[in-house]
Amino acid sequence: MKRFFSVISAVILIFSQSFSQITPVPNGRRVQVAILFDTSNSMDGLIDQAKAKIWNIINEMSGLRYQGQVPMIEIALYDYGNSGLSESEHYVRQQLALTTDLDLISQKLFSLTTNGGNEYCGAVIQKSLQDLNWSTNPLDLKMIYIAGNEPFNQGTIAYKEVCSTASGRNIYVNTIYCGDYDQGVREFWKDCATISKGDYFNINSNEAVVHIATPYDESINSYNDSLNRTYYGYGAIGQSKKSNQLMQDANAASESEAVKTERSIVKSKAAYSNESWDLIDAVDKGGKDITSMDDAELPTEFKGKTDEEKVALLEEKKGERERYQKKIAELAVERQNYITAEKAKRTDLSKDDFGTSVNGSLMKRAKEIGYQKENESTDTPK
């Protein structure tokens, strides 16, 4: 009997070591991004562009490295200018504090609705500066993106003072004006960006995002379906979070196959981590020991098994997940090469939209403080 338990202990020890060896260890660096959307009546097109580009943006962010290591990606979401919001709060609402839960970010974005109101840019920027747990480390990348189409100086909160405060905390405020470039300048959108050392963009928010279909999309999304079957929700929130994972796949697919493909690629990367509800990620991150968990907390597939059987099944499913992630990552490289070649042939893809504005400024600022963009072919599965 002693020998039997020794064997189990050895298997568990080896399995635990294998998890620690294959998991990219964040080096303490963070990439923090707060997105502030005008949700007044005229901004439906802006929200549509964001839905179409959110996974492309996250893919760009997840390719950043600092001294070869993977930074933590945190995203926050606010909306402002909606008449359904509280006047006493300057028509500003926090949808989501800084979080690493990428499915939740998608859920909140797809739930946004528009309604006429007063757009107070200074107020929503101030709110994000006050509410969020911004890093104080100058090596962490901290970005605010505010998008809208009304004069920037509306409301009682002085935008100049707020943008200056952001600059003093090494937080770049980037402004995206939905309309004519010069009109945005006249309405002070460029001024805010200049004060905070951020970037100013203008976009046509009513223009649909153009996606390039590739021969690799179908295969990538097929592997994503297989990847989903390696996720096992545990504890009180496990099942609802698993359901939300599938719902956000569906939301992405409702935009286009290309958008779903971008999401599938994100799910092959270290940035897509779900240790709060997925059993494999929970053990992978070191916070859970499957042999000490109650059966009631475990997903159905793991109930009633011996410790040795639980560890063996977890190892099997972890291996399956890594294989699917690797396949997706390999195809993602081929897909990107195809897209790059197609872009070189076409002239209809040169205009800025919400996604290109965010990606361009984010990569520029990241490089300025020492981040590099790692080729996706070398991105290590989480």
Where are these regions (language model features)?
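Divalent cation-coordinating acidic motifs and surrounding scaffolds
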Residues: 21-207, 214-217, 285-295, 301-303, ...
